[in-house]
């Protein structure tokens, strides 16, 4: 009986020793109890999108979720997500934007919806819009003094195209298709000196500002009926008048004494008034500034009208036989 008790005690001691040995082995190797065979990775549903609104249904937290004033964390998360979703749905489909800043020197948008100084080249007080496929005069900066918009498709100059441009000195619209100019488009430009409009389709001249010094309307379709009888009388600063290659049948009357150069070649002029250039009653008067008159390319015979140009320092260029 004592032997049986001794054997039982020995077996119990061996089991205790074995258990202690296993515990020490597991504490030395934390991965000893990790069996990778128990973990299976499935790629079939790897790209499945998890909806956060029912996230607490996918994972059962049980009693582990903390309570926030009687509301579970999962419920609170779902509530906030729902509120943010509803807020996103109520955003306006066409949100309003703030008014863009004023363009200043860039000027307002032109034909292409861009500011003028992005379509044209603005250098100081000069604006260059040559060959820019423009159909109208673009809005210009208020400081513009020189405008070059040559070789475009401009067909009409409107009354307000140059409104407020009190510093504008030169307009060059050569090589467009301008057929008409509103009468008020130019006359209110106090600083305008040079108006350059050759190679257009003008049939008449508008009222011009008294500040004009150079007027170039060569190669248009101007007729004598399209020039008012007193069109040039008040232009006391006009020095250069170029009317060549038009459809004129008479020399414009009332030319100012300031005129230095008059080009009328290649028109349809057949006759000349006695007072076209000189005062028939004042034989001692000499019109010295007017030294350059061209009438070549016209059917007129200048030798038939000597009294019309006796006061000139030089004979006009043209046919005398």
Swiss-Prot record:
Domain LRRNT: 105-142
Disulphide bond pairs: 278-311
Signal peptide: 1-19
InterPro entries: Leu-rich_rpt, Leu-rich_rpt_typical-subtyp, LRR_dom_sf, Mimecan/Epiphycan/Opticin
Gene3D superfamilies registered for this protein in UniProt: Ribonuclease Inhibitor (3.80.10.10)
UniProt-annotated location(s): Secreted, Extracellular space, Extracellular matrix
One of the GO BP terms on file: negative regulation of angiogenesis
Glycosylated position list: 301
Site (Cleavage): 20-21, 104-105, 109-110
UniProt keyword terms in alphabetical order: Disulfide bond, Extracellular matrix, Glycoprotein, Leucine-rich repeat, Repeat, Secreted, Signal, Sulfation
Post-translational modification: O-glycosylated (sialylated oligosaccharides).
Cellular component GO terms, alphabetical: extracellular matrix; extracellular region
LRR repeat copies, ranges: 143-164, 167-188, 191-212, 237-258, 259-279, 289-309
PTM sites of type Sulfotyrosine: 61
Family: Belongs to the small leucine-rich proteoglycan (SLRP) family. SLRP class III subfamily.
PANTHER family reported for this sequence: EPIPHYCAN-RELATED, OPTICIN
Function per UniProt: Inhibits angiogenesis in the vitreous humor of the eye, and therefore represses neovascularization. Binds collagen fibrils. May be involved in collagen fiber organization via regulation of other members of the small leucine-rich repeat proteoglycan superfamily.
Oligomer status and interactors: Homodimer.
Protein name as catalogued: Opticin
């Amino acid at each position: 009986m004592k032997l049986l008790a001794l054997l039982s005690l020995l077996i119990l001691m061996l089991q205790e020793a074995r258990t202690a040995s296993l515990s020490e082995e597991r504490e030395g190797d934390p991965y000893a109890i990790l069996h990778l065979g128990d973990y299976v990775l499935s790629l079939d549903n790897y790209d499945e999108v998890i909806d956060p609104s029912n996230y607490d249904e996918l994972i059962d937290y049980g009693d582990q979720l903390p309570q926030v004033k009687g509301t579970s964390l999962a419920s609170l998360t779902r509530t906030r997500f729902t509120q943010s979703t509803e807020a996103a749905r109520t955003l306006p489909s066409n949100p309003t934007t703030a008014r863009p800043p004023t363009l200043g020197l860039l000027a307002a948008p032109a034909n292409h919806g861009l500011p003028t100084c992005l379509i044209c080249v603005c250098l100081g007080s000069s604006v260059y819009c040559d060959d820019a496929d423009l159909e109208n005069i673009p809005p210009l900066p208020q400081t513009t003094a020189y405008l070059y918009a040559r070789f475009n498709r401009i067909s009409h100059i409107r009354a307000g195209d140059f409104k407020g441009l009190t510093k504008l000195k030169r307009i060059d619209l050569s090589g467009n298709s301008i057929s008409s100019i509103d009468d008020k488009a130019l006359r209110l430009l106090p600083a305008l000196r040079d108006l350059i409009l050759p190679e257009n389709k003008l049939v008449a001249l508008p009222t011009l500002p008294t500040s004009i010094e150079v007027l170039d309307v060569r190669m248009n379709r101007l007729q004598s009926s399209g020039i008012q009888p007193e069109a040039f009388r008040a232009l006391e600063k006009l020095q250069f008048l170029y009317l060549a290659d038009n459809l004129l049948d008479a020399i414009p009357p009332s030319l100012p004494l300031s005129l230095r150069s008059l080009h009328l070649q290649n028109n349809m002029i057949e006759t000349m008034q006695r007072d076209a250039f000189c005062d028939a009653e004042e034989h001692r008067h000499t019109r010295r500034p007017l030294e350059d008159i061209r009438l070549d390319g016209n059917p007129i015979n200048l030798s038939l009208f000597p009294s019309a140009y006796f006061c000139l320092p030089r004979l006009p260029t043209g046919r005398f036989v």
